[in-house]
């Protein structure tokens, strides 16, 4: 049985830990607000960027589309870009992303594909290096970055483009955590390269005007809006494709930051609650032992007085 001094020391230690977890929870809550706003602001921009790309691609023949959009026509070599946090103390946030990537790696290897991995964030690199260190070809360190910006997305996208131009891979997939709510972050796999065939994009993004041509038949004629591009659509698409790649990566990074802060706030809140419960249990144990000690001392005093 622990002595009273040991119990006092443990209570003091847990209280000190609780102060730290509460402070970390408050910091995460403040950062979450900014990160959530940034992620939500990036979503419509990234979606509109993809819509514009698809619309322009509809006016370009498949053979004239940029290589990043067409791909190599093969799927033998897969590049997986796994984005996690630089630090821990955020529950299962990093583990869930790594688990999603592991599932993909196992499926690709079982299908006889070649897998290459680029990690963004220290925690993902630590987890994946345990089993797939030989597959990891690069690591992008963001430890010194205080606030994720578009410059970090450009670094990642440029590295991917360089590898693609070198013929290092056929298909590229980005793994990150989509921010749903403070308590819900969804591990997501997003295909970066190839971006999709223009022919498939036409049906999804045709803009039509509906005009009534006959009051009797109420028939509707759909007329597609035709755009003119300066310079030509192919040149515009060539410039938009790498930009879209950077934008989608930037959106994923912002989603990751928001998810990390949400997971960290939840984890620190749980830690603070657990510390409070532990303090209560230790305090009860301390009071019981102290009461028993006082009772024993009183009995000894009474017994000694009776002996006299």
Curated annotation (Swiss-Prot):
GO terms for biological process: proton motive force-driven plasma membrane ATP synthesis. Keywords: ATP synthesis, Cell inner membrane, Cell membrane, CF(1), Hydrogen ion transport, Ion transport, Membrane, Transport. It is a peripheral membrane protein. GO terms for cellular component: plasma membrane; proton-transporting ATP synthase complex. It comes from the Bacteria. GO terms for molecular function: ATP binding; proton-transporting ATP synthase activity, rotational mechanism. It is found in: Cell inner membrane. Produces ATP from ADP in the presence of a proton gradient across the membrane. The gamma chain is believed to be important in regulating ATPase activity and the flow of protons through the CF(0) complex. F-type ATPases have 2 components, CF(1) - the catalytic core - and CF(0) - the membrane proton channel. CF(1) has five subunits: alpha(3), beta(3), gamma(1), delta(1), epsilon(1). CF(0) has three main subunits: a, b and c. HAMAP family: ATP_synth_gamma_bact (MF_00815). Belongs to the ATPase gamma chain family. This is ATP synthase gamma chain. The gene is atpG.
